[in-house]
UniProtKB/Swiss-Prot annotation:
This is Ornithine carbamoyltransferase. It is an enzyme of class 2 (transferase). It comes from Campylobacter fetus subsp. fetus (strain 82-40). Gene3D superfamilies: Aspartate/ornithine carbamoyltransferase. GO terms for cellular component: cytoplasm; intracellular membrane-bounded organelle. InterPro entries: Asp/Orn_carbamoyltranf_P-bd, Asp/Orn_carbamoylTrfase, Asp/Orn_carbamoylTrfase_sf, Asp_carbamoyltransf_Asp/Orn-bd, Orn/put_carbamltrans, OTCase_ArgI. One of its GO terms (molecular function) is amino acid binding. Belongs to the aspartate/ornithine carbamoyltransferase superfamily. OTCase family. SUPFAM superfamilies: Aspartate/ornithine carbamoyltransferase. Its EC number is 2.1.3.3. Keywords: Amino-acid biosynthesis, Arginine biosynthesis, Cytoplasm, Transferase. Pfam families: OTCace, OTCace_N. It is found in: Cytoplasm. It comes from the Bacteria.
Length: 309
C-alpha cells in the first residue's frame, strides 16, 4: 500500500506519472466526462486546520470521481478530545476507503498511515504540503516549463512550502534557490534529505538570505504568507523581520523574461507580494488554485491503484 505523506516518499517517475494522470483527469473534467475511478468509495477528511482550497478541492474531487467525502473537524471526532491517533486510525480504516488529513504534526499522519490500513494523504502539515506542490508542478508544466531544467526562486519563510519545494527539486532535478531571512531558515534535517536526493537527481540547491540574488534570472518566483496559521502572535515581529522580502515589480524585474509567479494562497498584498505583481500574475495564481482539484484527484486515484502493492 502506498500513502502520499511527502514527495520524499516518491521517486521522480512516480511524481511525473501522477502529473500525467492529473492532466488526463483534468481533460476529462473540462469535457464534462467524469469517470468514476473511485466509485462508491468514501474519503474521510480530517481537518485540525481550517481551509478553503483543501476542503473544497477534496470534497468536489472525490464526488467527481464517484465517491463521497466525509468532513471531520477536530470538534467532530474523539481525536480532538484526546483519543490516541492510532485508535482513530484503526476505527476509520474499518469504515472508509481512504483518509486525507490536514494537521499540525507530520507524526500524526505517519501514525494514521501505520494503523489505518487504508491510503493516507497529507492535506497539509507543519512540515510538508505535498498536494500543493503537485498543483504547482502541474501548473508550471501547463505553462510550458520543463520540470527538470527550470530555475525556481522561493522567497520568504522557511516553512512547509519551502520544505516541499526542496523535496520536489531534489527529486526532479530542477534548480531551486531559497531565500529566507536569518532566523527563518529551512530546518537542517530537511536540507539533509534534499542534499541526499540531489546526489541522484543532480539538482542545484541554493540557500541564501539574499532575495534579489535568488530571483535573478529565475524562470519561476514563488512565495507564501509570512504569518502562517498559529503564528498570529508573532505577526508584528515577522513583518519587521521580513522587510525586503516583498516580491514587487522591482524584484520581479530581476527574474527571467516572462517569468512566472505562483502563490499557494491566501495572499496578503503589501506583505509577501505587491498588489501589482499579484494582479499581473493572477491568471497563473488562480490556475494554480484550480489545479489543486485536478492534482488531488490524481493523487487519490494513484493511491487507490497502489493499494495492494
Amino acid at each position: 500500500m502506498r500513502h502520499f505523506l511527502t514527495l520524499n516518499d516518491l521517486d521522480k517517475n512516480e511524481i511525473l506519472d501522477i502529473l500525467s494522470l492529473a492532466k488526463d483527469i483534468k481533460k476529462e473534467a473540462k469535457s464534462r466526462n467524469y469517470i468514476s475511478y473511485l466509485k462508491d468509495q468514501t474519503l474521510a477528511m480530517i481537518f485540525e486546520k481550517s481551509s478553503t482550497r483543501t476542503r473544497v478541492s477534496f470534497e468536489v474531487g472525490i464526488h467527481q470521481l464517484g465517491g463521497k467525502g466525509l468532513f471531520l473537524s477536530s470538534r467532530d471526532i474523539q481525536l480532538g478530545r484526546g483519543e490516541p491517533v492510532k485508535d482513530t486510525a484503526r476505527v476509520l480504516g474499518r469504515m472508509v476507503d481512504m483518509i486525507m488529513a490536514r494537521v499540525y504534526k507530520q507524526s500524526d499522519l505517519e501514525e494514521l498511515a501505520k494503523f489505518s490500513g487504508v491510503p493516507v494523504i497529507n492535506g497539509l502539515s507543519d512540515d510538508f504540503h505535498p498536494v500543493q506542490l503537485m498543483s504547482d508542478l502541474l501548473t508550471l508544466s501547463e505553462l510550458g516549463l520543463n520540470l527538470q531544467t527550470m530555475k525556481v526562486a522561493y522567497v520568504g519563510d522557511g516553512n512547509n512550502m519551502t520544505n516541499s519545494w526542496l523535496m520536489a527539486a531534489s527529486k526532479l532535478g530542477f534548480e531551486l534557490r531559497v531565500a529566507t531571512p536569518k532566523g527563518y531558515e529551512v530546518p537542517q534535517w530537511v536540507l539533509d534529505i534534499a542534499k541526499q536526493n540531489s546526489k541522484i537527481s543532480c539538482a542545484n540547491l541554493i540557500i541564501t538570505d539574499n532575495p534579489k540574488a535568488a530571483i535573478s534570472g529565475a524562470d519561476v518566483v514563488t512565495t507564501d504568507t509570512w504569518v502562517s496559521m498559529g503564528q498570529e502572535d508573532e505577526k508584528e515581529k515577522r513583518i519587521n523581520d521580513f522587510a525586503g522580502y516583498c516580491v514587487d515589480d522591482d524584484m520581479m524585474s530581476l527574474a527571467a523574461k516572462d517569468a512566472k509567479f505562483l502563490h499557494c494562497l491566501p495572499a496578503y498584498r503589501g506583505y509577501e507580494v505587491s498588489e501589482a505583481v499579484f494582479e499581473a500574475h493572477a491568471g497563473e495564481i488562480f490556475s494554480e488554485a484550480e489545479n489543486r482539484l485536478h492534482a488531488q484527484k490524481a493523487v487519490m486515484v494513484w493511491c487507490d491503484r497502489k493499494r495492494y502493492e
